[in-house]
Amino acid sequence: MPDYDAIIIGAGMSGLYQLYRLREQGFRVRAFEAATDVGGTWYWNRYPGARFDSESYSYGYSFSKQLLEEWEWSEHFAGQPETLRYLNYVADKFDLHRDIQFRSRVTAAVYDEGSRSWTVTLENGSRFSTRFLITAIGPLSTPTLPRIEGREDFKGASFHTARWPKESVDFTGKRVAVIGTGATGVQTIQTIASQVGHLTVFQRTPNWCAPLHNGKIDAETQAKIKAGYPEMFARCKETFACFLHTPDPRGAFEVSDEEREAFYEKLYGERGFGIWQGNFRDILIDRKANATISDFVARKIRQRVKNSAVAEKLIPKNHGFGTRRLPLETFYYEVYNQDNVELVDIMETPIERITPEGIRTSDKDYEFDIIIYATGFDAITGSFDKIDFRGVGGARLKDKWRQGPETYLGIMVHEFPNMLMLMGPHTALGNIPRSIEYSVDWVTGLIKFAMERKLTRLEATPEGVKSWTDHVKALGEGLLSNEVNSWMTGINSNVEGKQTRIVARYSGSAPAYRARCDEVAAKGYDELRLG
């Protein structure tokens, strides 16, 4: 008999809930976590300004009425420290720590056909066997550093945003470089600009950003939030991407120019992702419609940035608004009006190397005390590539996915029996915690089904994998976001072999995804090979 009924890799948001649900069913379960405590993304990403881009109250767990009553978010978009406190509160409340082994990085997982079990190997060489293997390793958890010579030569301090130290970093009077202007770069830049002596931002690709409009939650609003939780979570189940916002049913050209401008102005002044997820229905599929919102936001950037040359560098020219995941900001553009902030366009003057004193571009040597790498993640498949997963006959998952992931429902892979993925490739993302809860509940239902019937082997069929993968690819056709180089299309210039676009995510609606998964469960999982 295996050591465990289920092993979970990871103790972030998905791992914690999966542990809770399986333990609730009475199964023998263990979670292995590389960090020293729970939190996942919110444990590692401690960089200045890290916070939600989903409303706090729509991001937290919905499974416990008592938890919803007890916990009070202080802001509409909570910062990393508060979010980490929340996840620790959850772990303490449901006594989850006792079944999590920390400082335990999983390096390999090998399936044995004879015993129909997985052997999981940790970095320290320890091994554990399990009937079911559940990956809760997150789509954005493997940081990448730029392929620039000389990184090790720098004599100052350097940090990646996703591996920020627990101790606070003193920026007072320091000469600081930030490489990267994605979501983490934007949050970091706008937060430290008022603290540093001088800030130099190295930008390769500008991103469209929109105001976050965060604020404190007062007692009256807190009471309304708590009273409205059932309605709010029901709404999240109905919306396209599980956010509070849903697309406007009108097309961008079904209204007058004046109405369209007023609508964009209204969205620009509202909290959160409304301008992205609550916009006209065609802005992400029709180039002309997209051009109207892109032009509107470009005009806003020009209004907010005083130096016209700098403003133009901050306006994307190679992709339309919303075709990449949208960073939300708080006075980000105004940062570039400060005398102590400089923007370097590395498409014009590329970085040649890191020097002991700082950064050398094609036209200048810069000296710094601190370099911050806001260079993102090897997204979606990167966390799987870091672990040596081997299925039937020693098949390597990394080899199987070399030309792009192939999955069944984004949860299972042919030749990898009893391996179940949470938030893996080809699954619904959006407001991730809402998708996490559904995926965990579905996986729990499948394991319960198997255990009750003494089934020891569950495997996706080649036909099922092909059908789902083809379906996911078809859904992506016509979406402007799939014509753009970004982490959502598998592009990462800092990772060898990831310079070709792939279909890495499910582009359909979350309700449609759940309906398909529910259909499979309702039919007794007969699309799987059960044994």
Question: What do the PLM-derived regions correspond to, one by one?
Answer:
Residues 163:
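Flexible, glycine/small-residue-enriched loop-and-beta-strand segment within the central core
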